[in-house]
């Protein structure tokens, strides 16, 4: 009761099994599905956390077919980031073009399903609708501002965000440092704020985006100084999302 579980499940199955293997080298897709179905049968709430690699982003239709077939109620696609200290994973890194192409295709499929009353909840779409309807930012980085999350490792080491769990960004240790000091640590604020790319200064979405999450700059947003994947996605999706937000406001407005 009052517990939300996260299920790490990459889509489609070939993408999951290529990178999520057990100690014997076997893919784990089937085992994760078994665990997810156990949660469903028990009536326990869960979200699916799906890593958006370059391979997954190239297959938006296959990803959405899997979402439908598995009857996933809530899903969050997390961009596969370029490595801070793990170059062996660079080959799976998402690109801004891949981000935009994937989300535009998934948005069309999601909107079509929504018109028929059967759309899965996609976190990015939900977050944008909430932002447009209320002005409230519910996701760290969505408006370009970092909010310390204080990730705590088993040895007590504290980091400002799960995207920055490396020695360079270690804020301190929960066993020895006061919580307020950890929240004020430079790595939890100033170090995560990068200067905005020059393309942002003339972008019509600047007030909505604020430059976005600095850690996702090269995967979701900028390629050089001439293209932004997030702006490309918003060009297509924002009119529909704005309409949904307006309809939601009308429905919730007191008589």
Regions found by a protein language model. Name each.
Residues 131-141:
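Short, basic/aromatic recognition patches
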Residues 117, 155-157, 166-169, 195-255:
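Radical SAM enzyme core and accessory elements
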Residues 1-80:
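Radical SAM/AdoMet-radical enzyme domain recognition
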Residues 14-19, 74-97, 120-133, 159, ...:
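Flexible glycine/acidic-rich beta-alpha junction loops that bind and position SAM and/or redox cofactors
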Residues 7, 106, 156:
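Conserved, mostly hydrophobic/aromatic
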Residues 143-146:
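Short, small/polar residue-rich loop motifs at catalytic or cofactor-binding pockets
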Residues 97-132, 163-204, 210:
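C-terminal accessory region of radical SAM enzymes
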């Amino acid at each position: 009761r009052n517990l939300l579980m996260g299920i790490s499940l990459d889509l489609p199955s070939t993408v999951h099994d290529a990178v999520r293997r057990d100690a014997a080298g076997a893919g784990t897709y089937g085992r994760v599905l078994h665990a997810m179905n156990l949660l469903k049968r028990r009536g326990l709430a869960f979200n699916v956390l799906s890593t958006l690699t370059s391979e997954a982003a190239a297959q938006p239709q296959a990803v959405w077919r899997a979402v439908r077939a598995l009857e996933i109620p809530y899903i969050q696609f997390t961009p596969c980031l370029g490595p801070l200290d793990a170059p062996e994973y660079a080959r799976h890194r998402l690109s801004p073009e891949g981000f935009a192409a994937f989300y535009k295709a998934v948005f069309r499929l999601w909107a079509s399903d929504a018109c028929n009353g059967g759309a899965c909840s996609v976190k990015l779409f939900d977050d944008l609708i909430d932002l447009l309807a209320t002005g409230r930012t519910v996701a760290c980085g969505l408006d370009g501002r970092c909010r310390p999350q204080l990730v705590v490792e088993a040895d007590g080491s504290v980091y400002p965000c799960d995207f920055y769990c490396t020695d360079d960004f270690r804020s301190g240790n929960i066993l020895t440092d006061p919580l307020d000091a950890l929240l004020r640590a430079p790595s939890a604020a100033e170090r995560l704020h990068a200067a905005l790319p020059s393309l942002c200064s003339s972008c019509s979405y600047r007030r909505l985006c604020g430059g976005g999450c600095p850690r996702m700059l090269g995967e979701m947003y900028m390629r050089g100084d001439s293209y932004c994947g997030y702006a490309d996605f918003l060009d297509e999706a924002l009119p529909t999302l704005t309409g949904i937000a307006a309809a939601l406001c009308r429905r919730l407005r007191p008589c």
